[in-house]
Amino acid sequence: MAFTFKQFHIDDHGCGMPVSTDGVLLGAWAPLSKAENLLDIGAGSGLLSLMAAQRSEAQITAVELDDTAFHACNKNFIASKWQSRLNLVYASVQEFCNQHTDGNNAQFDHIICNPPYFKGGTQSSNRLRAQARHTDSLTFHALLEVITKLLAATGTASLILPSQSMTPFIEEVEKSELWMNQLTNISDSRFKAPHRHLFTLKHKATKLAEDDTVITNNLCIKEPDASYTPEMIALITGFYLKY
């Protein structure tokens, strides 16, 4: 399916994880204003990289393992006005991490990722969708190891996960060299419990220089009449044609 945003176009045909509200929320919410060297883990169609290119002046490296998604992402990058700042790498993030840390390559001051989150259970019959959604392809432990190695000392990683994945993810974070310093709980309406969570991670060493209190707030997506809330509109106004 094709999606036209205000400043770029996405064709996600054949991608395991198509354009979604989750991706748009993460791309619009992540604190990217000071990003100079950004990594997109599991780029898919390139949505997060293109949103980051619109919101910052960063040089962006996108890593994608799936062949179909890689080619779709490449086409979307070439069609954008930020092609000169977008670098697409065909590899698993573990392979990329090993290659990148083997030399004198700079670490990334921002990492963005909409990670796979289903663990066990019945996988989709669509191989690409299963790979994009299930942690068999990238466990939380492996993801946090990669972020720890690739994130600059004062850098920030931005992610999104559903509620059912937060407890096992936080357990892994607590065993890692990272800590969660910002959390936004997302609900569909003011009368429903949060179902998604946007959050940032930083190196634990930064807790010596910062207040280690987690900055927590809430975001409600829709009003009772199903229209978007002012808070949601404020996030997406730079991207959705209607707003």
Swiss-Prot record:
Reactions catalysed: adenosine(37) in tRNA1(Val) + S-adenosyl-L-methionine = N(6)-methyladenosine(37) in tRNA1(Val) + S-adenosyl-L-homocysteine + H(+)
Family: Belongs to the methyltransferase superfamily. tRNA (adenine-N(6)-)-methyltransferase family.
Pfam families in the record: MTS (PF05175)
Lineage, top ranks: Bacteria, Pseudomonadati, Pseudomonadota, Gammaproteobacteria, Alteromonadales
EC number: 2.1.1.223
SUPFAM superfamilies: S-adenosyl-L-methionine-dependent methyltransferases
Function field: Specifically methylates the adenine in position 37 of tRNA(1)(Val) (anticodon cmo5UAC).
Organism in which the protein naturally occurs: Shewanella woodyi (strain ATCC 51908 / MS32)
Residue ranges of the TM segments: none
Record keywords: Cytoplasm, Methyltransferase, S-adenosyl-L-methionine, Transferase, tRNA processing
Stored CDD domains: AdoMet_MTases (cd02440)
Name by which UniProt lists this protein: tRNA1(Val) (adenine(37)-N6)-methyltransferase
Cytoplasm is among the record's keywords: yes
Protein localization: Cytoplasm
